Amino acid sequence: MRLALGIEYDGAGFCGWQSQPNRLAVQDALESALSQLAGHQVRVSAAGRTDTGVHALSQVVHFDTEAVRSQTAWVRGVNTKLPRGVRVLWAKEVDPRFHARFDAYQRSYQYWLINQPVAPAVMAGKAGWFHQPLDLQAMQEAMAYLLGQHDFSAFRAAECQAKSPVKTMHHASVSAFGSSMIFDFCASAFLHHQVRNMVGALVYIGKGKYPPVFIAELLEKRDRRCSPPTFSPDGLYLTGVGYDGCWGLPGTERKLQIGIA
């Protein structure tokens, strides 16, 4: 039997998603909890791998098991064995052909940036921070250049293992709620560090160092060395994974609720 799970986690206390020799990754915590409940060793496959410090509101995984449990029992049982920073949101039996990674046709990320003179204390590790005032309109204009199909090499980490830097950006926007800014991205897939590198470039535009067309120039150059530094992982959230309705999964997108009454 193959099961799909929706997962939420706080990445601040983990060495990223992917299993590590020190067993301090989110995947390690989840597999340990599932193995205890299933009574056998469980290995999961995820829709995407997040880096150290990156969070998820809607990660999707699948695994195979012969253990018989109700979907509610899987959720409640696994959550009792997980550390505080990881929770299973839902469980669903799926077709044995379903694959959390390869059947995903798009992924969504949000970046929460607090723009104020002093670094936040309560939200440390949960949001990025920038001390200089940022021009929201300039960043909004710049993000329009990201839409569509592009070679995103200028925003690609050196260690990225993706076969191609060409991706399709379906949505890119930024909104402000008081001192908070939310950068919202949806694409067919993302390169390693792509969102953090795009946010880094947008912040440079927002503080007035470059005009909005700088994004178009970076895309044309296809050279990571021409782009501003990678931004902090603290405010980055995996918020959604898109699947065809034929798989019958529950809602797989959960947005940040900043500024919503």
Curated annotation (Swiss-Prot):
Q: Does the keyword Isomerase apply?
A: yes
> What's its catalytic activity?
uridine(38/39/40) in tRNA = pseudouridine(38/39/40) in tRNA
Q: Which GO terms describe its molecular function?
A: RNA binding; tRNA pseudouridine(38-40) synthase activity
Q: Which chain positions lie within coiled-coil regions?
A: none
Task: State the family named in the UniProt similarity comment for this chain.
Answer: Belongs to the tRNA pseudouridine synthase TruA family.
| Physiological role | Formation of pseudouridine at positions 38, 39 and 40 in the anticodon stem and loop of transfer RNAs.
Q: What is this protein called?
A: tRNA pseudouridine synthase A
Q: Which organism is it from?
A: Methylobacillus flagellatus (strain ATCC 51484 / DSM 6875 / VKM B-1610 / KT)
Gene this chain is encoded by: truA
